[in-house]
């Protein structure tokens, strides 16, 4: 009996000496379904619970800046890199271990100058088109050519999309400011704006317009749900290092103000790991950046996209693109 009591007391002492893992709060600007899938996988692997506070990335970045050191967030998970760059410029992010950053480092993948955020997945800008009206040979070799009278009331776009804004940045970098403004004014005059990429896709599927500029994963999700044989649309990849072939990136960071930095860093490391990337790409047709992971969706190989090696990674680039949208009358 005495021996049993000693073992019980020893077990209790060891339990008390082991610090409990803290739950973490993630400000989530990524699509909620994807973030929830990764959060659930992380909790199963570590026992650490994750609370998601989901909203648009720009909105959350602004909220974090306003909250400052009082922010309850431990991690910021963003669908776009510019939102992370905003917080990095404000010195609100914690440096990450090289082991985490190196998990997804690759050709063309943006890297934080301060090593305080990590890129996690990519999405390709594409042209979705109605196969009842068009074939591949009818489509343009450059995204710039869709902002012309030929495509009047035939081409759709989502000007409030973060990826659309990043595409403007790419045009500025590759073709110059004048070309970017001309493109925006052309789309404004000849194209049809939609509130979301998914709405633009549905407009093409319904035959309302002939084509639209969207991100690849909207079509892949739609085709998986309906069955690819049952949809009237297909994707066209512009290639040729054109701005229309742009790949945009999601990423994550740990906040300096976090009271649970160890757990937060474990979560970001998990996002970049094979296990985390598999959880993400099982539910969403984004390109995993960890080279050891292959998507469950039938994606065009990222090496064949011939994407331009540019990305929006600074606050000033994003602000410049926003001003161009204003000049074109889109905002």
UniProtKB/Swiss-Prot annotation:
<keyword id="KW-0410">Iron transport</keyword>
<comment type="function">
    <text>This protein may be a central component in the iron-acquisition system.</text>
</comment>
<keyword id="KW-0574">Periplasm</keyword>
<dbReference type="InterPro" id="IPR006061">
    <property type="entry name" value="SBP_1_CS"/>
</dbReference>
<keyword id="KW-0408">Iron</keyword>
<keyword id="KW-0479">Metal-binding</keyword>
<feature type="binding site">
    <location>
        <position position="218"/>
    </location>
    <ligand>
        <name>Fe cation</name>
    </ligand>
</feature>
<dbReference type="GO" id="GO:0046872">
    <property type="term" value="F:metal ion binding"/>
</dbReference>
<dbReference type="InterPro" id="IPR006059">
    <property type="entry name" value="SBP"/>
</dbReference>
<feature type="binding site">
    <location>
        <position position="31"/>
    </location>
    <ligand>
        <name>Fe cation</name>
    </ligand>
</feature>
<dbReference type="GO" id="GO:0055085">
    <property type="term" value="P:transmembrane transport"/>
</dbReference>
<comment type="similarity">
    <text>Belongs to the bacterial solute-binding protein 1 family.</text>
</comment>
<dbReference type="GO" id="GO:0006826">
    <property type="term" value="P:iron ion transport"/>
</dbReference>
<keyword id="KW-0732">Signal</keyword>
<dbReference type="GO" id="GO:0042597">
    <property type="term" value="C:periplasmic space"/>
</dbReference>
<dbReference type="Pfam" id="PF01547">
    <property type="entry name" value="SBP_bac_1"/>
</dbReference>
<feature type="binding site">
    <location>
        <position position="79"/>
    </location>
    <ligand>
        <name>Fe cation</name>
    </ligand>
</feature>
<feature type="signal peptide">
    <location>
        <begin position="1"/>
        <end position="22"/>
    </location>
</feature>
<protein>
    <recommendedName>
        <fullName>Major ferric iron-binding protein</fullName>
    </recommendedName>
</protein>
<dbReference type="InterPro" id="IPR026045">
    <property type="entry name" value="Ferric-bd"/>
</dbReference>
<keyword id="KW-0406">Ion transport</keyword>
<keyword id="KW-0813">Transport</keyword>
<feature type="binding site">
    <location>
        <position position="217"/>
    </location>
    <ligand>
        <name>Fe cation</name>
    </ligand>
</feature>
């Amino acid at each position: 009996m005495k021996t049993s009591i000693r073992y019980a007391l020893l077990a209790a002492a060891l339990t008390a000496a082991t610090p409990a893992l803290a739950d973490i709060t993630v400000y989530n600007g990524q699509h909620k379904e994807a973030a929830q899938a990764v959060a659930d996988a992380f909790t199963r692997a570590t026992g650490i619970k994750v609370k998601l506070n989901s909203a648009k990335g720009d909105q959350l970045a602004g909220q974090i800046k306003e909250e400052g050191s009082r922010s309850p967030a431990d991690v910021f998970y963003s669908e776009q890199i510019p939102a992370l760059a905003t917080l990095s410029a404000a010195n609100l992010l914690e440096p990450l271990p090289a082991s985490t950053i190196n998990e997804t480092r690759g050709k063309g993948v943006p890297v934080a100058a301060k090593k305080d955020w990590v890129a996690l997945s990519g999405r390709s800008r594409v042209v979705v088109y109605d196969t009842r009206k068009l074939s591949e040979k009818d489509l343009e070799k450059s995204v710039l050519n869709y902002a012309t009278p030929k495509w009047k009331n035939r081409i759709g776009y989502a000007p409030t999309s973060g990826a659309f804004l990043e595409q403007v940045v790419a045009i500025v970098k590759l073709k110059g400011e004048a070309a970017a403004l001309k493109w925006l004014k052309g789309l404004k005059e000849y194209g049809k704006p939609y509130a979301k990429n998914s709405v633009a896709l549905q407009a093409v599927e319904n035959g309302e317009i002939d084509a639209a500029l969207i991100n690849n994963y909207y079509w892949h999700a739609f085709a998986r749900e309906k069955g690819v044989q049952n949809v009237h649309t297909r994707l066209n990849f512009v290639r040729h290092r054109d701005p229309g072939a742009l790949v945009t990136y999601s990423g994550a960071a740990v906040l300096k103000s976090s009271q649970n930095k160890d757990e937060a860093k474990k979560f970001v490391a998990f996002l970049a790991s094979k296990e985390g990337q598999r959880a993400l790409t099982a539910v969403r047709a984004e390109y995993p950046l960890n080279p050891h992971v292959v998507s469950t969706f039938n994606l065009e190989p990222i090496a064949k996209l011939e994407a331009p090696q540019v990305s929006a990674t600074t606050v000033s680039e994003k602000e410049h693109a926003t001003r161009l949208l204003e000049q074109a009358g889109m905002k």
